[in-house]
Amino acid sequence: IAPFMKSYKQPFLAQLRVKKRELPKNAVETWNVIGLIEGNDPLLKNEYIVLGAHYDHLGMGGGPSSKSDKIGIHHGADDNASGTSALLEIGEMLMAHKTELKRSVLLVAFGAEEQGLLGSKYFVDNPVVALSQIKLMINMDMVGRLNDAKQVYMGGAGTFPGGVELMKDLGPPLGLSPVVHAGSVGGSDHVSFYKKNISVLGIHTGGHSQYHTPEDKVELINFEGQKQVCQYIFNAIMKVGSTPYDMKFNPQGD
């Protein structure tokens, strides 16, 4: 996976919700991390699928925590080590099938999502390619807790033609039961792209009581389930990325 331009890093300043005595200006430099897998079609390689996941969490907790009175390491195993590990895994899978890709894929690990989608907002306000060239953004946020019913949840499938049908059809061959919300987008870094009239998919495996608490630990991750989710997302990218799939933006799934 090549760096985009000369570096993998896209630095930006994040305004953090911390005490002034800790950081006088309440701002730190952080990064989006960007890799490129270039497509092979002379024309379609200039169109991009963005696959993203945020890599930040809550540190020692405090105000943003669901247990704000309990200071302790917030491990963020599902939110969102699951998403960033999926990003790496799917990136490796895509590289193994690179010759089949017509469209290009940008792999982006976003910083400062927990502070208000700051990394993805910076990305779309300072795009590394023209926004008109980004045809689909797939976001993975909390994809490590697949339940016994094998339900994969997503918003945004209605933002491009055939999206609902595609994401439903890809599930059963893998033993998955996609829960596709056609008319809603959901909330995470993909929303920043949706607001710029870009088709999106926001994928997760459901909420749980450990969300934003110190109890979100690796012992609770369903590794076999996450493997299935990675294959599901990979199959979606290959479908959209290896065919001249119609990616016309449909606002709010209409």
Model-derived segments and spans:
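Second-shell loop/turn segments in exported
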Residues: 18-24, 68-80, 109, 149-158, ...
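Short, solvent-exposed loop/turn and secondary-structure capping segments
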Residues: 45-48, 60-66, 117-121, 149-151, ...
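Solvent-exposed, acidic/flexible segments
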Residues: 26-28, 48, 76-84, 113-116, ...
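Stable alpha-helical elements in mature extracytoplasmic
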Residues: 1, 33, 80-86, 90, ...
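Metal-dependent peptidase/peptidase-like ectodomains
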Residues: 1-3, 110-208, 222
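Acidic/histidine-enriched alpha-helical segments
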Residues: 100-108, 137-140, 243-253
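His/Asp/Glu-rich mid-to-C-terminal helical/loop segments that flank catalytic regions of hydrolases
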Residues: 92, 96, 209-253
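Soluble metallo-hydrolase cores and metallopeptidase-like ectodomains found primarily
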Residues: 1-76, 89-92, 96-99, 125
